[in-house]
């Protein structure tokens, strides 16, 4: 078994910023129907494992989540189930056997409130950053529109003003093909 480097940290009652990418950064989630299925699985499985999703975005070759888990040990079960079910779906759909869909996931414990909101904003602008849309509100596979509809454009603009985005991209999580 390969050990993740750095090792995952599973803590109870903790908020995390998560990034997961497809194997070799391939755009496997490349249709609306596939993205809809992955977003459905994400929401359904998070409920089963007591994972509270604060914000998320799903792109054709990676996703980002901002979440909280009550029991740290549930996080590994959540990702195992999400990645297993989504890979099975995609491989069945495309009639491919035993293809590796996901590479790994990276987690980071949220340090403080500012860290939370900066990553909240980063998630919501990610589809624009990677060129999948010109406006955040036009991208369907994100919680941005949900927050916009619930809280209004002034609230969203204030989030971005108070906690500007920092580009967290490193070479290993640069998802440009």
Regions found by a protein language model. Name each.
Residues 1-177:
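Short catalytic/metal-binding and nucleic-acid-binding patches
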């Amino acid at each position: 078994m390969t050990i993740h480097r750095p090792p995952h940290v599973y803590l109870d009652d903790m908020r995390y910023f998560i990034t997961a990418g497809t194997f070799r950064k391939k755009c496997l989630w490349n249709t609306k129907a596939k993205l809809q299925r992955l977003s459905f699985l994400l929401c359904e499985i998070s409920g089963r494992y007591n994972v509270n999703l604060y914000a998320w975005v799903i792109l054709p070759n990676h996703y980002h989540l901002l979440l909280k888990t009550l029991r740290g040990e549930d996080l590994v079960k959540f990702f195992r189930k999400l990645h297993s079910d989504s890979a099975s779906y995609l491989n069945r759909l495309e009639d491919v056997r035993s293809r590796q869909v996901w590479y790994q996931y990276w987690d980071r414990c949220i340090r403080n409130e500012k860290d939370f909101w900066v990553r909240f904003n980063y998630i919501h602008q990610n589809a624009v950053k990677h060129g999948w849309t010109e406006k955040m509100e036009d991208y369907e596979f994100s919680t941005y529109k949900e927050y916009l509809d619930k809280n209004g454009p002034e609230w969203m603009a204030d989030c971005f003003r108070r906690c500007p985005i920092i580009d967290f991209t490193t070479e290993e999580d640069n998802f440009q093909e």
